[in-house]
Amino acid sequence: MDIFSEFLNCLSSDGTLNESSIYKTYQILESLNPKDVDTKENYIKLSNTFSTLGSGVGFQDNLLIEMFKILTVLFFKTRSTDLGDLLIESFTSLEIEKLMRVKKTIGSIVLTKGIQELQEIELPKVGFNCMTYDESIFQGISLERLILQLMSIFIAKCEENKLWLVNNRKDLDLRVIGQRLLHRDFACRFLSGLFISRFSVSGDTDESKHQNGIRLQLFIDFSKFETRLTMQILKADRIFSTCVANTVHAYEGLFSSGSNIDSTIATLVLEPRDLIVYRKGFALLQIPWTSVTTIDKIKKVKSLKIITEVSSLDEFVFQCKDGDKFDELFSTSEEIMNKLLPAIIVSPKLTLRNRSIIQIKEGESKLPNTSKQASQNLPHLDDELAYQRFEDQVIDKSVCDDECTNTENTPSSNIPADVKDSLSADDYAYDTKRKTQIEDLEEDQNKSKIASKDGTNLKEINSVPEFSDENVINQTGPAKKTPVQRRKDGKFAKSTKRKKQKSLKPDTENQESSVKNKKAKSNVNLQYSPKTPICKINDETLKPPTIANIAGHKQMNHLTSENIETPVPVPNGNWYNGVKHETATDIFTTCHDGNNSLKSSVWKELLKEKHWKQESKPQLTGNSRQIDLSTFVKQANTPNITSLLDGTCSSPPNNECFNDKEPDSSSSTLISDRQELEYRNPNAETVKLEEIPYNKFFKTVEKNEAYNPSSKSATIDGLQRYTSMIGNQIYEGILQNEKELRSKLEAYHINCNKVIKEFSKRQTARYKIIEKELAQIEVNLVSQIDSLMFK
């Protein structure tokens, strides 16, 4: 122990480390007591040294290799997850040449000790439906993750280590790695499959398949699997899909973070101590539940916004693909968080201490009984997907913290099974605290208002979610819930408002007047209403709503508190300018309504009302939506983008368009009507416009009378249909231009971020080199001054 203490003192005091002292320290490591080594002070000294050891500056190659040997032995000796993380971080930060040199030198030590540790660790005897881990079980799972991850790093692109492991297969039990394919933990299953797949031979020939089968037998006992495994199944994408098939709480959807504008296809897996996000072409994201601070539910787009304390990922949004599983996803995550956090009692006087709260606006949602039996069969998957980027990437190093409390050892574990099922998550986990909390609640219910430090009064709370009165719940009218807000005195308050429903009576007067006045009825038909037939806009170019970079975007049109359950802005994207897809009416309509439409004049109404000069938005009729093209501007990420429709309706139509006559005395605007007439009368070869009475289409104009389009114009059948087609093309052009601008902006931001990151890396490396050189110069100056003083 004295030699090891001297070694640590040299590290902390920047003393000279020679090869002999390092070699002596390495020799006595096996005889040390793990409890004496695994202390906070020793970890601080080691982390300060190995955090700068990754740059490799100031260390020779032989000393660098010996230092990593010492850290490797310390990790397997103490089984400390902190030392394991330090080993992986410092090793992966080395330069490529030094990394490969260290990998080839100490690879045999890492593989030998890793397999020996996996032999001693037993698989947890818990089922796939279990969503709680004992602390000892979780410590073993965390250690297995680190060992498999470290072994996978030393195998990647290193044929020497692969050959050494195969040659020593008789001394090492390689099948302990294949046993992890049946592990309860998702990450262990994924890492074991990734490790085995690195031994595969590329190619589709019979010889390559034969070699893959032989190598697969080294790691897997086929008698424990009902289906035949192949190397192709254990590839990165394929093994992930196989692991998801054996996972109960796995959900597919779209993932987007604050730094990424576009959403990527991802799969979210809920584990008892952490949640895992997998995106094709990226490394796994492992986020411990203890670092999750807030979960907001967006019911409108079936999404969850999760805010974390992880520095690299402050927040992200996951949109569930299957709407039926969204409630299960939300309730499962709520149940897991309730087991990790202390009980929350919602009362008129809220005092919540010591931990952060999940702000959930969807009321009390319980975990549905939708758990399925885990399938032991590995399913046959589709064609193998190309996966190149994942070869050098392994599971993310941000594994679960150890701050989780042991919920299975609570006194409530003695409750019978039938009673547990009837209790909620909070009642089940915190049954022993109810008596004191109910007493405090009875005292607090006598107070109707709470005064904060600044003198402001909170509104009266009419209902309590956990201790509610039936008379309060049965009140008429929907309850408008406000989110949990923090007061200035550091406490929380929650209020509930109720609005009485207004009695809606049918507007019989307007209906009678519209029936009596035929002209008014024709005007009503021109407006937008749910009964008006609409022409569908082509949805092929429109994407579904995506959860993109929503910071800085404007709020959507007609966004109310009823459409969204949490104070989260709805993502902006190519989605009808933020309008709900289910209830959004199209921009253009047609007014084919029998004989009534024939008696009205479209041009008359257009010239009379002059929609192109109106600055205010038109009035809405009922629940319909009306958009004026002259003021319509598509929202976009880039500001100050003018609409392409400005100027298209700047002036009314000229009279010349009505006076241009063809030889058959028909207006040039009625050419499309001829085609419709020919289509409607298939028996006649050609239908001339003179053969049809004029009173069906337009009124007779006297020869000596001047033509006044405002009073006597033709009612054109199908005009709105062609107008809508033109508008649709304009709208699609706007969307296409916006896509191009957005893609250019995204590429520009990505390039800027890359340049900034590379510059910061270069600067930090330069500063480290300068600091080391200054330290050496200082030491030399001090030594020279001492020598001069002695002389």
Curated annotation (Swiss-Prot):
Keyword Nucleus: yes
One of the protein's GO biological processes: meiotic DNA double-strand break formation
Top-rank taxon: Eukaryota
Name of the protein in question: Linear element protein rec10
Gene assigned in the entry: rec10
GO cellular component term, pick one: nucleus
Disruption phenotype: Abnormal linear element formation. Abolishes localization of hop1 to meiotic chromosomal axis sites and DNA double-strand break (DSB) hotspots. Severely decreases localization of rec15 to chromosomal axis sites. Abnormal sporulation.
Source lineage: Eukaryota, Fungi, Dikarya, Ascomycota, Taphrinomycotina
Record annotation: effect of changing E309A: Decreases interaction with rec15. Decreases meiotic gene conversion at ade6. Decreases spore viability
Region: Disordered, residue numbers: 462-523, 644-672
Main location: nucleus
Location(s) in or outside the cell: Nucleus; Chromosome
Biased composition (Basic residues): 493-503
Motif (Nuclear localization signal): 485-492
Keyword Isomerase: no
Protein task: Organizes linear element components on chromosomes and is thus required for meiotic DNA recombination.
Subunit text: Component of linear elements (LinEs), which are similar to synaptonemal complexes, at least composed of rec27, rec25, rec10 and mug20. Interacts with rec25; the interaction is direct. Interacts with hop1 (via N-terminus); the interaction is direct. Interacts with rec15 (via C-terminus); the interaction is direct.
Annotated Polar residues bias: 644-657
Keyword entries, A-Z: Chromosome, Meiosis, Nucleus
